[in-house]
Structures are given as C-alpha cells and as structure tokens.
Amino acid sequence: MITRSSRLLCLSALLALTASVAVAQDALSYQTPPKALADLVTVPPTPGVSLTSKGDVMLILERASAPSIAELAQPELKLAGLRLNPANNGPSRASYITGLRLKKLPNGTEIRVKGLPDNPLISLVQWSPDETKFAFAASTQNRIELYVTDVATATATRLTNRALNATLGGAFQWTSDSKSLIAKLIPDARATAPAANAVPTGPTMQDNSSGKRGQAPTYQDLLKNPSDEKQFVHFTTSQVARLGLDGSEQPFGQPGIIATASPSPDGQFVMIETVHTPFSYLVPVYRFPVRTDVFTIGGQLVKTLNDGPLQESVPYSPDGAPSGPRDFEWRNDALASVYYTVALDKGDPKVKAEVRDRVFMLEAPFTAEPKAIYDAAFRFTGFIWGNGTTAIASERWWQTRKVITKLVNPSTNFAATVLFDRSSEDRYGNPGSPDTKPNQYGREVLNILPNNDIMLVNGQGSSPEGDRPFVSVMNLITKKITPLWRSEAPVFERPIATLDAAAGVIMTTRETPDENPNYFIRNLKKRIALIQVTSFPHPYPQLKGITKQQLRYKRADGVDLTATLYLPVGYKKSDGPLPTFVWAYPAEFKSKEAAGQAQGSPYQFNRIAAMGGAVFATMGYAVLDNASIPIVGEGQRAER
C-alpha cells in the first residue's frame, strides 16, 4: 500500500530529478574526444590542387578540417532523391574549399587570391578554356554566388548579383570563347517558398492498370505527396542565362526544372534538359520526364531533340537502361554535333540481342534525320573523342563484368576495332586510361601524338606486389604497348597530369608512410632530377612512427586475402598481443582469381583520417584496415 508520505517522497525525488536534468541540459555543450583524436580532427588537411593543361600554373585549394556546426545546422529538404538546402538552393551536404592560392610552376611564389568573400565556402572551381581565368561558386547562408578570378592579378570578382541554383548540380559552364558562362539562376519573380504541409488532402493513388510486372530498387528521399511536389518545383526551378564578363545577360527560354545547360563546343548553341510532370512517388528525379532542347546562343529555340517519358519500369539490373533516347551529349571534337544512345533491347538485359545499344548523331543546324554511327553489343558507356579520324568507344556488361574498349574511325562510318576486352574486376590487367588534353574549344579530347601514339595512365597500377602506378604508350596503328615508367619501392608515386606528352613530362605525387604527398615534375624520357613544386608538411608529425604492413593470407576456400596492418608508435613484438580493430566491408566478385588480387601499397602515406579505422592506432590499438572480405558468386546464379 502506498501511503501519502511515500507519494510525497516519490514526487520530491521526481522534481529533484527533473531539476537536475534541466540544469544538466542547460549546461551541456559539445564534448571533445581524447586529445590524440581531437588533434587529428582539427588539423587542416593537405590542400588539393588544380593545374592548367600546360602545367604552368597551379591553383592550390585549401580545405577545412571538418564542417562547422553552422554548416551542419543548415536546413535540409529530401525531395525526389535530392538532399538540398532550401536556404541557399544548393546541396545540403557538401565539402568546401576555404582558400585559394596561385603558383607559377615550377618555382614561383604562392600568391593568395584576393577578393574572396569572408569565410568563403567555395565549390565548382572551373578553368576558362583559355586558362586565363577560373570561375567558382561561393555559398552563403541564403544564396550561392558566381565569382570569376583573373589569374594574372590573382583577383576574384563577383560576376552578377543574381544567385545561382545548384540544387540539380551543373550550376554553370564556360563558353568556348572564355568571355561568358552559361548559368542556372534563381528566377527573378520567384514567389515565397511553399510551406510544407504534413496534413494529407486525400489518399495517395498509384495506378498499375497496365498490369506490368517488374522489380524495383528501394530509393531514398522520394516525393510522397502534393506538398512535396510543390516544394520540389519551387526549389529546383531555374532560369538559364548567358552571363558575359562584360556584365551582359541573355536568358534562354522560360524558367523550368533545368537538369543541364551546356554550350556547344563552338559556342553557337546551348543544349538544355528540362524535367517536367508527371512526377513519380516511386523513382527519383533522374527518372522523371525530361525534354531536350537546343537554342541558339542568342536565345532562340532551334529544335526539341527529344521529350522522354517517365521511366518507372527500367529493368532492375545494373545492365538495365531506359527504353528511349538517353544521354544527349555534345561531340567534343566537332563544332556542334549532338550524339545520344537508344537501347535496341528496350533496356532489358534479359532480352537476347546482338546489338543492345545504338548511338545516333545529329549535326547543326539539326534539320536532318539523326544518323546511326555506332552499334554496341553491350551497354554503351561513352566516347573519348579525338579528331575526325580517331575516337575511343567503351562498352560494359555488369553480369559478366566485361569491359570492351574499341578504336573508332569517325570518317569511315565509325569502323571499330577492339583495343581491350577484359574484366572490370581484373585490376592487374587494367591498361590505364588514355591521356586527354583540352582542344581549341576547351573540351577534353585524346592527346594523339604525331606518330599515332597515345599515353596510357594508370593511377592505381595494381600488381601482385601491391599498387604500383604506371605510364605506358600505345601505338594506335600497331596496338603495341610500351611501358615508360612505374612507381618503385620504397616510394608510392602516382601520375596526376601530363604536362607535355611528346617530351614525356608528367606531374606526379610522391609519398612514403612518413612523408606527406607532394607534387613533382618528372621527365619520363630524360634521366634528370625530379623537380619538387610543393612542400606540404606532415599534418600530424606527432604520429610519425606508426608502422604499416601489407598482409597477404589465404581463406579456408583458397581465396587470397589482403589487409593493411597499423601498429602504434613504439610497439615491439615483445610487448605482446594488442587489442585489434578490424575495419572492413564485403565486396562482390565473379571469380576467386579476381577476389584474390592484391590491393593497396605499404608505401603510401599513413593518412590517419578521423573517420577511418586507422585512427585507433593512435590510441594503442592494432588496426587491420581494409581487410578484404570477398563474396564470390560464380556462374549464372550470381547475375541479377
């Protein structure tokens, strides 16, 4: 039996507890981890870099150690598969550049860029085609602004008072004359944002009267009701305009949900893709209906190339594709030619077909019928354009992991010969990627040397000894591949840019377990000393001495496994066993041979990221990092 006195005692205790909780909540602030971990979180990361194509100027990109609490506290809307910030019309989750420096190579003085906004949050850095300027987006709490920097004076200037709309990405792109940019802007007459309404006005209806059956993946952050639709339309609607460096502004069409807006290589046309209704509650925005239009640079509509339907029934497979025209792109080595792909198997990998994808091309003035230029036995993944007689086409088929690379001659009805036919899982057999360079329009094309050689660059360079990046040369006539250079122990060196392919001059990063990656100029043909162009210090010298070993061992079924073992500073085997963290995630493979290939390098810098597994080595633990856990599915049953 509960007496009156006991009830009073319970009430007093409850009030005391409530008061103590309230005091604790009032006094509570964000806590800090142990100092060893806090030092890793707060140290500025090594800057990134961006180079001109000639390698004469380096842009150094400073980054913050972590986003601020103010950045993390920004609002977020999840609509149609997007996560956007309604306050500034950009992505809600982004990493930013916080400072810019310019350096003339190889030995110029670093100059800090002037004219940046206070506490800058910079993204989307993009060189002009003539490389005398670069543009970038600067985010604030309530808008995203477009800046252009003059390289000669290292001065940034805001180009327009209009705010960018970056909710769907691709907020701006230079035209080929380097005198203007095509940008997606917040419309002038945009109304107040519609308030979210969680109260339904009626049931959500879904119609499958066609009786079609099919699997569908589970997508995140889809539209759920008419209120979501209104917010989606409001925040993704843009006005495309050409912004001149002289202050001029030329709009294109009406405001709409602009997915992409890209100028032609010659700068005379602009291709715009506009998302429109009907929307879907089953698939994200990239499956919504989209209309593809071409405008003149003066803003007049030339032609609607396609108006694609809602794609709710794309076969559930990595080899599935939309059934109609898709992937409209400009041909990089032509003045104004559009190419696109159509799945002849209706996008269904279960349908047997000798030709699965057909590529079509349409040249300006876009009045003729599209011309079929390439047939792909598998899914077409793209061209690397070169010139009027040379291009490289790629195909892939996920079910078998097949990747095919073909040499194509655009001048002879796109006659094709196979260069490589390999498995995407075969890291050892990866020949590397063809070297490219910007052409006169500022578009990337194959860097073809006078003797029909091209460089092949592999920044990973997997081998039985671990990763060893390399550079080789392939002759496009004989198909012969000649190795030029490969990273050698005890250093990990990675090619990151070709400065002069004919002379064999490249830029690399070099690192060791205790030496931070820095940038060097290497001549592959002359045995001359490397030229060091950066001297980034060790970000956490207090952690020098953490040891790293590359381990190889066998699983019970005979599959070779790899892992990287980190041991604390000063640890000796005589100290006995250590508590150990295993940091791993399983991966799928089609064969035991591919699953057993080595990965990683014992000579890479000991980068102790605060969010990674290796950080526990700073606290006295052993860490088995990136331990391979292959799931091998051989045969047809492994397909989906």
Predicted features and spans:
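Predominantly five- to eight-bladed beta-propeller fold
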Residues: 64-101, 186-241, 276, 280-360, ...
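Bacterial N-terminal signal peptides that target proteins for export
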Residues: 1-11
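Serine-hydrolase catalytic core recognition
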Residues: 276-279, 325, 333-335, 353, ...
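Asp-box/WD-like beta-propeller blade repeats and closely related beta-sheet repeat scaffolds
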Residues: 116-124, 141-227, 313, 324-325
